Amino acid sequence: MMYLNELLSIPTLQELTLINQNACLDRPVATIESTETPDVISYVPKNCFIITTAMAYKENQEKLCELILSLDKLPCAGLGIKLGRFIDELDPKVIQTADSVGFPLINIPIHLTLG
């Protein structure tokens, strides 16, 4: 099994950057899932790394805090968000929530595809 820190060191993924400071990067990654559904927690396997544009949260980033806490409990390896598409920057409360549980938030640069 690969770990998130190993995934982020793959040459084609080195442009992905950590958003929050208190993130545990030694989380196992079993799968990578792409989703835009707000009820994703019901449909993803444990130890997945989720990539998203966070379109469903553009009007209410507070819901991202709830998602982060749910994903952390699953457990999930982390959340990659393509900032600049629907959300330009994360609300500080979202980052604080992720930091409070050591949950990795990863920025996916706007010029990279999610596929």
Named regions from a protein language model:
Residues 1-115:
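Alpha-helical/coil-rich non-catalytic "connector" segments in signaling and regulatory proteins
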